[in-house]
């Protein structure tokens, strides 16, 4: 009876088209702040639950019935169940006694909190079991999180089976699930149709309720709230994320890390980097997952990296028991089953590789696959919506947690329908059709899609090219580039900028040489080799990354006090005025017509998206939205560019005539100033036409249009370059925030994130250098940590792996500066007298030692 889940095959084109119709209508409702289609909120009035048949259990079970205040979600009702607080349960009001195999009738209204999954009973349903019950409604706990399964299982009711209708020789059972009601409502069919079961109208109305002040922006905030708390799937989980919370490994190399276990690509592999016979993969399983088969992908061509003997352990915490011991055929290329037919949920499964072929020291695994029978999922937890959790979401604060919970349930249903058809819409759907454009209007909702990550990965794989047969070698003079950066007016053509030197160096030398297409596999992580003139360096990646960082700094300087050495971007008015939000941002220069270089910038952005490198461009959401194809608006997006102008026009719109004439007199004409300080006419001859009070609405409209479109051509050129490297389907599937993060990296460099990415080699755990190092980084600002990251790795944003070794002086206290090798992302850490000295030396090195000292070698050309 269940409708198709995400990614499942739909029964017919009719069902597919019906769901597309539904999505289009729902998207329009969301944008307009209207109630969603009623079919999405369907709740049956009656569901029959049967007591789970456990032969080892008692023949009779008492099921406690709890009373809930109001609708069952009240903040501050500590101990109340169900509710938004999941503290100790207070005493139940009554109990229902059932024999094993007996049934209880409930409504279809459900609620999930920290105690588990609850279902609601009406007064009539309670009376079937309790003759003197005084409750108007009650709640039964169907499933606890720790049980790994439901004590009560929903089934078809006998009444439903008796009411089956014989229509055209087909038995039509009344439809119970909301997915089926959506299909019935929006799929056209000839002849008689199944009918939905009797609806629980009160529950449906509660789900559909939209507060009077609710807007589409509130829904977007709710989606981001859910994503922050639920939706950030571990990027390393890939193909097993529906079963696994997280994957940990004993060790890994930077290039062949844990993500390779689940990328569904047999050409990649996880490779350990540790001691012999101490390799393991630990899976933290999602609640309710029971493993039917656990498979490892191996390849005999890995020689002595191939696992020979694997032992699997499982259980809770540190209490793991041996489950299987498997010897692997040394000639195998493919999957080997190392665990099967489990009957209970195991929170932790640990795969230990105890022996490799030919006594190999390290191991390679090309994949982990799981086949599972998922027990009933508990659903969205109502406890999430406590006021303390909503501080970062002002639009949601003050809204009843009960309303937020039910709205979130409805949005999750919408996402489930979207997931079921997403692979039909992208990339094959005609983008000119209205339906697709309507769905794109709610792109932020894709954050919660389970199908999207695999679709993005597949689109990128399908469009990638082979890596170049040779690596371009570029000769870069950074001394001239530094002189240009200090005084750009001496070099108006910007020939000495690193950006220009790289651009010219990558041009094909003759008509037969193909230009770089930047669509390489992710593992091709050095796009060109740099020879820095008058600097000794063997570039194994560090010099290349430094050139990207230099170009980023030239395009969008991080300091507001330095001139902008290239003409492609200009500082926003907010940065110049020191007002409003996003005061460190840049926008494309409306006066710059060098569209070929804008296109190349777009190609570099696409290459960064495909690979592991970053091109850090400080652009506001106003620009990223245009690049990703999202709609921009004056009120939402332009305050990040020129907040003073936005406020001025807002005041002008509502001002009276006397105030307007006093403030503007005859000085305001039909002109406006663009971001590059260029004055443009809004109408022909606008310089000489005064704006009268009656003309102000037209003037405001013209200013908004001119400013919103001021860099339209430049953005279009960047997008054209981006689309040469990244398929349109990928941009359709990514939100603008995700596009920015994939191109630029994570601007927030936290100590917690650095701890996960930092590895100490040849240090004792008690070494004071380790303690001083973390104390120093804790005292750093985010800018300090970003500078430090670049000093060590050549990257200024995360993620970036760091390896730390003792310096050559060992334990001798010194005041020497730390050294780094960006090619290997290595820091050589001296022994300092105190954490304060360590902090000072690290900070000085981060800001003043950007040259690659330890990569030096004699070089003469």
Curated annotation (Swiss-Prot):
Broad enzyme group: transferase
PROSITE patterns the UniProt entry points to: DOC (PS51284), HECT (PS50237)
Annotated SMART domains: APC10, HECTc
GO terms under cellular component: perinuclear region of cytoplasm
DOC domain residues: 219-397
CDD domains listed in its UniProt record: APC10-HECTD3
UniProt GO molecular function: syntaxin binding; ubiquitin-protein transferase activity
Catalytic activity: S-ubiquitinyl-[E2 ubiquitin-conjugating enzyme]-L-cysteine + [acceptor protein]-L-lysine = [E2 ubiquitin-conjugating enzyme]-L-cysteine + N(6)-ubiquitinyl-[acceptor protein]-L-lysine
Domain of life of the organism encoding this protein: Eukaryota
Chief location of this protein within or outside the cell: cytoplasm
Domain HECT: 512-857
Localisation per UniProt entry: Cytoplasm, Perinuclear region
Pathway: Protein modification; protein ubiquitination
The enzyme's E.C. designation: 2.3.2.26
Pfam families recorded: ANAPC10, HECT
Keywords, in A-Z order: Acetylation, Cytoplasm, Phosphoprotein, Transferase, Ubl conjugation pathway
Modified residues (N-acetylalanine): 2
Catalytic residues in the record: 823
SUPFAM superfamilies, A to Z: Galactose-binding domain-like, Hect, E3 ligase catalytic domain
BP GO terms, sorted: proteasome-mediated ubiquitin-dependent protein catabolic process; protein ubiquitination
Transmembrane segments: none
Modified residues (Phosphoserine): 12
Its biological purpose: E3 ubiquitin ligases accepts ubiquitin from an E2 ubiquitin-conjugating enzyme in the form of a thioester and then directly transfers the ubiquitin to targeted substrates. Mediates ubiquitination of TRIOBP and its subsequent proteasomal degradation, thus facilitating cell cycle progression by regulating the turn-over of TRIOBP. Also mediates ubiquitination of STX8.
Subunit and interaction comment: Interacts with TRIOBP. Interacts with STX8.
Name of the protein in its database record: E3 ubiquitin-protein ligase HECTD3
Gene that produces this protein: Hectd3
């Amino acid at each position: 009876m269940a409708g198709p889940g995400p990614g499942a095959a739909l029964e017919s084109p009719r069902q597919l088209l019906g769901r597309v119709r539904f999505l289009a209508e729902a998207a329009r409702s969301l944008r307009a702040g209207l109630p969603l289609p009623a079919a999405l909120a369907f709740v049956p009035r009656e569901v029959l639950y049967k007591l789970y048949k456990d032969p080892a259990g008692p023949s009779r079970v008492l099921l406690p019935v709890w009373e809930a205040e109001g609708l069952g979600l009240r903040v501050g009702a500590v101990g109340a169940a169900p509710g938004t607080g999941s503290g100790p349960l207070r005493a139940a009001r009554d109990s229902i006694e059932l024999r094993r195999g007996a049934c209880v009738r409930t409504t279809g209204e459900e609620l999930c909190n920290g105690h588990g999954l609850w279902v609601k009973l009406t007064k009539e349903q309670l009376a079937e079991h309790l003759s003197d019950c005084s409750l108007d409604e009650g709640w039964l706990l169907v499933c606890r999180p720790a049980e790994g399964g439901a004590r009560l299982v929903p089934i078809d009711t006998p009444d439903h089976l008796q009411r089956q209708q014989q229509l055209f020789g087909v038995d039509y059972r009344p439809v119970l699930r909301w997915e089926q009601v959506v299909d019935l409502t929006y799929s056209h069919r000839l002849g008689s149709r199944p009918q939905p079961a009797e609806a629980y109208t009160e529950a449906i109305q509660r789900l559909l309720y939209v507060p009077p002040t609710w807007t589409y922006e509130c829904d977007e905030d709710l989606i981001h709230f859910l994503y922050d708390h639920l939706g950030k799937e571990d990027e390393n989980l890939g193909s097993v994320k529906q079963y696994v919370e997280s994957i940990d490994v004993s060790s890994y190399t930077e290039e062949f890390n844990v993500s390779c276990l689940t990328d569904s690509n047999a050409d990649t592999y996880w490779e350990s980097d540790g001691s012999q016979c101490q390799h393991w993969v630990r899976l933290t399983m999602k609640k309710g997952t029971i493993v039917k088969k656990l498979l490892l992908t191996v390849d005999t061509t890995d020689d002595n990296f191939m696992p020979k003997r694997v032992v699997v352990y499982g259980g809770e915490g540190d209490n793991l028991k041996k489950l299987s011991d498997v010897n692997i055929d040394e000639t195998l290329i493919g999957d080997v089953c190392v665990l099967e037919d489990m009957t209970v949920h195991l929170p932790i499964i640990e795969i230990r590789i105890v022996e490799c072929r030919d006594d190999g020291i390290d191991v390679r695994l090309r994949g982990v696959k799981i086949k599972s029978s998922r027990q009933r999922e508990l659903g969205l937890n109502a406890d999430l919506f406590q006021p303390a959790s909503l501080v970062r979401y002002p639009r949601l604060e003050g809204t009843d947690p009960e309303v937020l919970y039910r709205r979130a349930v409805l949005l999750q249903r919408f996402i489930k329908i979207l997931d079921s058809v997403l692979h039909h819409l992208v990339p094959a759907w005609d983008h000119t059709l209205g339906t697709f454009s309507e769905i794109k209007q709610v792109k932020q909702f894709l954050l919660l899609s389970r199908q999207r990550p695999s679709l993005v990965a597949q689109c990128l794989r399908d469009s990638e090219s082979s890596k170049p047969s040779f690596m371009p070698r570029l000769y870069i003079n950074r001394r001239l580039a530094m002189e240009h950066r200090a005084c750009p007016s001496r070099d108006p053509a910007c020939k000495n900028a690193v950006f220009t030197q790289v651009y010219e160096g990558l041009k094909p030398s003759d008509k037969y040489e193909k230009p770089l297409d930047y669509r390489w596999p992710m593992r091709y992580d050095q796009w060109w080799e740099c020879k820095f003139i008058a600097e000794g360096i063997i570039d194994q990646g560090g010099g290349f990354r430094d050139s990207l960082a230099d170009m980023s700094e030239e395009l969008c300087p991080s300091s507001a006090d330095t001139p902008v050495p290239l003409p492609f971007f200009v500082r926003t008015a907010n940065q110049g005025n020191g007002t409003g939000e996003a005061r460190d941002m840049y926008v494309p220069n409306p006066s710059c017509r060098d569209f070929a270089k804008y296109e190349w910038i777009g190609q570099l952005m696409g290459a960064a998206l495909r690979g592991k490198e970053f091109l850090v461009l400080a652009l506001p959401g106003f620009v990223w939205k245009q690049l990703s194809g999202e709609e921009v608006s004056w009120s939402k997006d332009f305050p990040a560019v020129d907040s003073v102008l936005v406020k001025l026009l807002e005041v002008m719109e509502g001002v009276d005539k006397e105030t307007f004439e006093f403030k503007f007199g005859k000085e305001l004409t039909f002109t406006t100033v663009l971001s590059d300080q260029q004055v443009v006419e809004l109408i022909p001859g606008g310089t000489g036409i005064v704006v009268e009070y009656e003309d102000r609405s037209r003037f405001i409209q013209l200013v908004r249009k001119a400013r919103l479109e001021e860099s339209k051509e430049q953005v279009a050129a960047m997008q054209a370059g981006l689309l040469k490297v990244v398929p349109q389907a990928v941009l359709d599937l990514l939100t603008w925030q995700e596009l920015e993060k994939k191109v630029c990296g994570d601007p927030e460099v936290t100590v917690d994130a650095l701890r996960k990415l930092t590895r100490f080699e040849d240090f004792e755990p008690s070494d004071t250098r380790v303690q001083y190092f973390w104390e120093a980084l804790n005292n750093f600002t985010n800018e300090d940590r970003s500078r430090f990251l670049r000093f060590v790795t050549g990257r200024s944003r995360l993620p970036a792996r760091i390896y730390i070794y003792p310096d050559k002086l060992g334990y001798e206290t010194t005041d020497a500066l730390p050294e780094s090798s960006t090619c290997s992302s290595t820091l050589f850490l001296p022994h300092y007298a105190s954490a304060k000295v360590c902090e000072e030396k690290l900070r000085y090195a981060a800001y003043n030692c950007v040259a690659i000292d330890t990569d030096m070698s004699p070089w003469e050309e």
